[in-house]
Amino acid sequence: DNCESNADCHEGLECSNRKCLISFNSDETCSTGWDCVPGVWCRTHGSEPGKCDEDHRCPSDGVCTNPGTECDEDNICGYKEGEPCYGPCRKGLSCRQGTCLQ
């Protein structure tokens, strides 16, 4: 759904990059990380539907708590090159065979 503001989206969704996406810790279910706002991942718990409950956004001080990650220009704590991709890789890297690589 295209949106101009949060008012254009259903409850539990927010307007991000002109799309209505699921907010962090919303009751809405997700099937992939693309359903969630940027920096938030969709996590499944057993056979339950997925929830956008894994937050990888940078803290306000810009210092990520995991030493394998750093705050990138998209304001996401992304895993550095050569690190296992337990979450999003930093901007410019992609997850290949379980490792963040260029």
UniProtKB/Swiss-Prot annotation:
Disulfide-bonded cysteines: none
Keyword match Secreted: yes
GO CC terms, sorted: extracellular region
Keywords in alphabetical order: Disulfide bond, Ion channel impairing toxin, Neurotoxin, Secreted, Toxin
Cellular localisation: Secreted
MF annotations from Gene Ontology: ion channel regulator activity; toxin activity
Keyword Transferase: no
Domain topic, free-text comment: The cysteine framework is C-C-C-C-C-C-C-C-C-C-C-C-C-C-C-C.
The protein's role, per its UniProt record: Acts as a neurotoxin by inhibiting an ion channel.
Name of the protein described by the UniProt record: Turripeptide OL55-like
Organism: Lophiotoma acuta (Marbled turris)
